[in-house]
Regions:
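Conserved functional micro-motifs across diverse proteins
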Residues: 17-143
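Surface-exposed coil/turn segments at beta-strand junctions on protein surfaces, enriched
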Residues: 43-45, 95-99, 109-111, 158, ...
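Extracellular structured ligand-interaction cores
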Residues: 101, 129, 203, 227, ...
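Oxidative protein folding and maturation machinery
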Residues: 244-536
Length: 537
C-alpha cells in the first residue's frame, strides 16, 4: 500500500514514453549502505527516479542528504532535486515494522547510461554505491593496464626541494575551514612538528610552502571540511581554484607548473579504499583459519582492484595513474590484513614461556606464512613512497610476529640486544625473516624502507659511536640511492633531542594573551619575526 501511495505522489510528467527502467540493480561496491536496497531506477527525459526500500531497527532513524548526486559513465554529476517519502537532511524515524520505502528524484541522466554511481556526499558515514548497473546489462569492465613512469620514479625526482601550493577559494566566508590549510609530512621517519600549514587570507587566498623529498600524492587538509587531493613534486608550483559550497567544496581546478601536470583526472577520482572489515566481526582472529584469512584477503583485493579498474575506465586514467590508484588500494588492504595476522598469531602462540631455556624453541620454527600478504602490494617499487599510507605500513611492520620474535631471539644468550651487536643480530634476523616470508633473495624496497625507519627507534642510551655503527650496518644493506641518503639524515635528526616546550609567562604571555582571547577555539598561526639589524629574536 505504501509503495502504491508513493507512486501516486510522484509527478505524472516523470513517467512518459521512452523511459528506461532498471531493476535487479547491482553495485561493484557499496559503503555505509547496509539495509538499503535500490529496487528500481527509471531514466526519462525529465528526471531520473531511484526507488529505495530500507530495513532498519524499529524507531531508529535514517537520513539522506541534499548533497546526494548521481555520476554517469563520463563522470557528469546529476544533483538530487527532491525526495518522496522523506525530507532531505532531516531524520526519518522507522516505523514499528522496521521497513520503509522512498524515492529520490534527480536531474535526468542520459537514457543510454548503463553504469553509474550514487554518492550521498564526502562525509565518512555517508552512503555510496559505485558501479550501479542492471544485472541483465552484462557490463564489461576491462582490467586496467598499469605502468610505472620511469621519469616520475627517476633518481632526480628523489631530491630535497620545496613545492608551493597556492589557492583561491571562490565564495570564501570567514571561518571556512577554520581559516587554515595544512599538509601532513608522510615521509619516512617524519615527526608531527614537521607538518606545514598556512592561514587563509581574508580574500580567500593562501600560499603554503611544502618541503619535499620526492613526489607525493596526498591531501591538503582545511581545518574542517573535505580534504583536497594533490600531486606535487619538489620544485612544483600548484595553483588551486576552490569553489566553496557552504562549509564544503563544490569543485577544485588545478594548474601545475610541471610539464606533466598534476594528474588532475586521478585527483578527481574519489575512490574509497575497500577493506575486509574484520574489525566489525568480533574476536574472529581467535578462531579464523589460514584458509579463511586468505579467502577474505583474495575477495577484498579482487573487489578493490575491480573498483579501481572501473574508475580507470570511467575517468580515462593513464597506465601510470592506474598503477598509483591500485597501489594505494593494495597498500591499504595489506596494512589492515597484517594487523589481523598479528592478532591471529598472537592468539595462537600466546605468551612466551617463563623458563628461558624453553624460549628459543618457542620462537624458532614458527609459521609466518600469513605475512605473505605483503606480496599483494608492489614491494620493490620506489613510487610506494609517494602514497601517504606507505609510512604507516613501514612503521607498523615492527609489530609483525616475525619482527617481535626476532627481537626476542636477539635478546637471548650472551648478546645484549640493547648493545650494538644485539641490534645487528636483531636486524639480521628480521631481514632474513622478511626475505623468507616474501620468498625473495634480494632486499626489496619495502624491507629497505623498514630498516631506514627503524633509525627513529634507536635506544637513547647508545653512544654516538654505537649509533653510527648500527646505521653503517643498516646502510650496507641498502641499494636504493634515496634510502641510502635518508638513513643518514634520520640518524642525524633523531640524534638531537626534541624541541623543549616553555611555559609562557612575563612579556611573552602579555603579548599573546589578547590573541588567545580573541581567537579562542580557532587555529592560529603565529610567526616570530626578527627585526632587521637586531640581535634580539
Amino acid at each position: 500500500m505504501q509503495a502504491f501511495f508513493l507512486a501516486c505522489m510522484l509527478p505524472a510528467f516523470l513517467f512518459g514514453k521512452g523511459e528506461v527502467v532498471y531493476t535487479r540493480l547491482q553495485a561493484l561496491y557499496s559503503n555505509n549502505a547496509g539495509g538499503w536496497n535500490i529496487e528500481k531506477v527509471v531514466l526519462s527525459d525529465t528526471a531520473t527516479v531511484v526507488s529505495f526500500s530500507v530495513r532498519a531497527k524499529p524507531y531508529s532513524w535514517i537520513q539522506m542528504a541534499s548533497s546526494t548526486y548521481l555520476s554517469d559513465e563520463k563522470a557528469v554529476e546529476y544533483p538530487v532535486r527532491k525526495a518522496v517519502g522523506l525530507t532531505l537532511d532531516e531524520k526519518f524515524y522507522m516505523p514499528k515494522s522496521g521497513k520503509t520505502e522512498f524515492q529520490l528524484i534527480f536531474a535526468p541522466m542520459p537514457k543510454d547510461t548503463k553504469i553509474f554511481d550514487m554518492i550521498e556526499g564526502d562525509g565518512r558515514d555517508m552512503a555510496c554505491w559505485y558501479g550501479l548497473h542492471d544485472a541483465k546489462s552484462k557490463v564489461k569492465m576491462p582490467v586496467a593496464r598499469e605502468e610505472v613512469d620511469a621519469e616520475e620514479v627517476g633518481e632526480n625526482m628523489f631530491r630535497t626541494g620545496k613545492a608551493v601550493v597556492r589557492g583561491k577559494i571562490e565564495g570564501y566566508k570567514p571561518g571556512w575551514g577554520y581559516g587554515i590549510v595544512a599538509v601532513t609530512d608522510n615521509t619516512l621517519g617524519s615527526r608531527p612538528e614537521s607538518s606545514s600549514s598556512a592561514l587563509i587570507r581574508p580574500d580567500g587566498t593562501f600560499c603554503l610552502d611544502w618541503p619535499l623529498e620526492h613526489p607525493v600524492w596526498d591531501e591538503l587538509k582545511p581545518g574542517c571540511g573535505p580534504d583536497i587531493p594533490v600531486y606535487v613534486r619538489p620544485g612544483d608550483t600548484l595553483d588551486l581554484v576552490i569553489k566553496a559550497k557552504g562549509d564544503g567544496i563544490e569543485t577544485v581546478e588545478y594548474t601545475s607548473s610541471h610539464p606533466k601536470g598534476c594528474y588532475e583526472k586521478l585527483l578527481k577520482c574519489k575512490v574509497p579504499e575497500v577493506y575486509a572489515e574484520w574489525e566489525r566481526k568480533g574476536e574472529i582472529w581467535k578462531t579464523l583459519t589460514d584458509e579463511e584469512f586468505w579467502a577474505m584477503t583474495k575477495e577484498t583485493m579482487e573487489t578493490g582492484n575491480r573498483l579501481c579498474d572501473y574508475f580507470v575506465w570511467k575517468y580515462g586514467l593513464s597506465p601510470w595513474e592506474a598503477h598509483l590508484l591500485k597501489a594505494r588500494q593494495q597498500v591499504a588492504v595489506v596494512i589492515n590484513q597484517t594487523v589481523l595476522a598479528n592478532w591471529m598469531l598472537s592468539s595462537r602462540y600466546g605468551y612466551y614461556p617463563p623458563n628461558e631455556e624453553l624460549r628459543k624453541d618457542f620462537y624458532e620454527g614458527n609459521d609466518y606464512s600469513l605475512y605473505k600478504v605483503l606480496n599483494e602490494m608492489p614491494t620493490d617499487d620506489p613510487s610506494m613512497s609517494f602514497i601517504p599510507y606507505f609510512r604507516a605500513m613501514v612503521s607498523r611492520m615492527k609489530d609483525m610476529q616475525p619482527m617481535t620474535d626476532a627481537w626476542s631471539l636477539a635478546s637471548m644468550g650472551d648478546v645484549d640486544w640493547s648493545d650494538v651487536e644485539g641490534q645487528r643480530l636483531m636486524d639480521s634476523l628480521q631481514v632474513e625473516a622478511l626475505r623468507g616470508v616474501m620468498g625473495v633473495k634480494e632486499i626489496p624496497y619495502l624491507v629497505q624502507a623498514y630498516l631506514v625507519n627503524k633509525v627513529c627507534d634507536l635506544p637513547d642510551f647508545l653512544t654516538p659511536e654505537g649509533r653510527k655503527k648500527i646505521v653503517e650496518y643498516r646502510a650496507a644493506c641498502l641499494t636504493n640511492p634515496y634510502l641510502k641518503r635518508k638513513i643518514w639524515k634520520l640518524a642525524s635528526d633523531y640524534a638531537q633531542p626534541l624541541p623543549a616546550t616553555t611555559k609562557l609567562e612575563g612579556k611573552a604571555l602579555e603579548i599573546l594573551q589578547p590573541i588567545v582571547d580573541k581567537y579562542k577555539g580557532k587555529y592560529v598561526q603565529i610567526e616570530w619575526m626578527k627585526p632587521r639589524k637586531s640581535g634580539v629574536d
